[in-house]
């Protein structure tokens, strides 16, 4: 895996090693792995900020970082956002978007085969930064059998960063200790959703009300949350 020769794991926390010292040691944490890793951070009285700082001080290299924003109220309507992309009501430096009624068509990119419901990718999956917005409630229904209307998280907006982009996001997190600032400054740099106004230039179209709410207008600030979970054998 990743051309490493050995790997060790406990729960969903994976460590890859190689006799080639140039490659170093790779720590891989997916969603569940992050929750389990937080149990160790909690026991050590450390935060994610402490861990990331220690990793950088020791010469760590960030290969990938995902920042996820959970929508608990359904403010993100993914079919509506997809329609806005088609109607040129998505103002973005990205040149591409893709939408799927389920995760089937991109299962080589996703761990979860068909369990993502409506999914919208903004940006190229090959680039160092792109966004993935999907119906988390549908995923929870497929995986855990939780009825869609009872799911605590309706949608998830993921910022996926690789290499240099991941490094600069970590640097921003460690400069401001404000995950909301870091996440939304990235989103606002790359994309905004607007409402078409026939008598105005596209650059002057107003932000969509729902999108304005999502990015911070008239809502409570967000914080970097931790939800430590023990691993199960």
Model-derived regions: residue spans:
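Structured, helix-rich domain cores that form ligand/interaction pockets
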Residues: 1-231
């Amino acid at each position: 895996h990743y051309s490493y020769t050995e790997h060790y794991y406990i729960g969903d926390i994976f460590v890859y090693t190689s006799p080639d010292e140039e490659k170093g040691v790779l720590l891989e944490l997916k969603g569940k792995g992050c929750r389990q890793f937080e149990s160790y951070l909690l026991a050590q009285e450390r935060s994610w900020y402490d861990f990331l700082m220690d990793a950088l001080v020791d010469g760590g290299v960030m290969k990938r970082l995902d920042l996820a924003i959970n929508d608990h109220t359904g403010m993100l309507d993914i079919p509506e956002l997809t329609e806005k992309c088609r109607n040129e009501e998505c103002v973005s430096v990205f040149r591409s978007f893709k939408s799927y009624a389920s995760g089937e068509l991109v299962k080589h990119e996703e761990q979860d085969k068909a369990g993502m419901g409506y999914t919208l990718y903004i940006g190229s999956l090959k680039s160092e930064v792109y966004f993935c917005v999907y119906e988390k409630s549908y995923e929870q229904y497929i995986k855990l059998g939780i009825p869609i209307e009872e799911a605590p998280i309706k949608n998830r907006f993921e910022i996926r960063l690789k290499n240099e982009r991941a490094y600069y996001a970590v640097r921003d997190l460690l400069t401001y200790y404000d995950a909301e600032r870091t996440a939304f400054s990235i989103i606002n740099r790359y994309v905004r959703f607007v409402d078409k106004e026939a008598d105005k230039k596209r650059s002057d179209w107003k932000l969509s009300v729902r999108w304005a709410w999502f990015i911070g207008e008239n809502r409570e600030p967000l914080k970097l949350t931790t939800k430590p979970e023990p691993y199960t054998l």
